[in-house]
From Swiss-Prot:
Gene from which the chain derives: bioC
EC top class, as a word: transferase
SUPFAM superfamilies: S-adenosyl-L-methionine-dependent methyltransferases
Phosphoprotein found in the keyword field: no
Protein family (similarity comment): Belongs to the methyltransferase superfamily.
Name recorded for this polypeptide: Malonyl-[acyl-carrier protein] O-methyltransferase
A GO term for molecular function: carboxyl-O-methyltransferase activity
Organism this protein belongs to: Marinomonas sp. (strain MWYL1)
Gene3D superfamilies in UniProt: Vaccinia Virus protein VP39
Pathway participation: Cofactor biosynthesis; biotin biosynthesis
Signal peptide extent: none
Length: 270
């Protein structure tokens, strides 16, 4: 699904939740890219203890166990827009008795002001509609001196898909992610202090164009317009796959992402 002006915010969030609900059972089997990003993000944690940790966009809980082990929190908050993702996470970590599973929108957090020592989020905030509003909300719930550590997709992700579609039609088939500079400007405008940021190109490789697209769909991140879009005919879809196949090299079919890794902090004095 593409985010367009004619899709209301509520409708968009409902569709997003349904998409990730459908992917909840297959997510872990296809989340190779997500695991690579998570490992790098965890290495950027600026603290070794935190009383209250919010895992924003927890999904199936890939980060929950690691955060709990490393930070020894008194309270974990696993928050996601998808109820089915939370169900998988809660079953997976049923032994974490200090963990609360919350189905909510990241842009409207049902949390008290200054309640969290750390907000951790891997590959979730790219689905938010207003980054500035999101960061203001994170500023609100973070304690003075607390941290926001996140990764997100940035402009230039999945160029292989855009290239394969080029010339076949004039439509956007990949979500237009925010430019890294604009993302950092939003963080600064929220009054969070930007401590560090990295923009990295991460490439994954597949046996076929179909398997590359499947890897998106099975984690709920299918952004190909043909997914439920009757305007893409079978013949046009076949033409797309043939164009994508032309990008094969000795490693296979590429699918690459621009990933922003960010550490920010709420000032101690505010």
């Amino acid at each position: 699904m593409l985010i367009t002006p004619d899709i209301s915010a509520l409708s968009y969030k409902r569709q997003l939740a349904k998409r990730f609900d459908r992917a909840s059972q297959s997510y872990d089997s296809y989340a190779d890219f997500q695991k690579v990003v998570l490992e790098r993000l965890l290495a950027m944690l600026p603290l070794n203890q935190a009383d209250v940790v919010l895992d924003l966009g927890t999904g199936t809980g890939q980060a929950l166990g690691i955060l709990s082990e490393r930070l020894n929190p008194k309270c974990n908050i696993a928050l996601d827009l998808s109820l089915q993702m939370l169900a998988v996470a809660s079953e997976r970590f049923s032994s974490l008795h200090n963990t609360h599973y919350v189905c909510a929108d990241a842009e409207r957090l049902p949390l008290q002001d200054r309640s969290c020592d750390l907000v951790f989020s891997s590959l979730a905030i790219q689905w938010c509609l207003s980054p500035l509003d999101l960061f203001k909300e994170l500023y609100r719930v973070i304690k003075p001196g607390g941290y926001v550590v996140f990764s997100t997709l940035s402009q230039g992700s999945m160029p292989e898909i855009s290239k394969a579609w080029f010339g076949l039609d004039n439509k956007e088939h990949v979500h237009q992610y925010m430019a890294s500079d604009a993302l950092l400007d939003s963080i600064r405008a929220s009054e969070l202090n930007l401590l560090s940021s990295q923009l990295s190109n991460i490439s994954m490789w597949f046996d076929s164009p179909e398997s590359a697209i499947y890897s998106l769909k099975k984690v709920g991140a299918s952004l190909i317009a043909s997914d439920g879009d009757p305007s893409v005919s079978p013949s046009k879809w076949k033409a797309f796959l043939l164009e994508y196949e032309k990008q094969r090299n000795e490693l296979g079919i590429p699918l690459s992402y621009q990933v922003s890794f960010v550490v920010a902090q709420r000032p101690n004095s505010i």
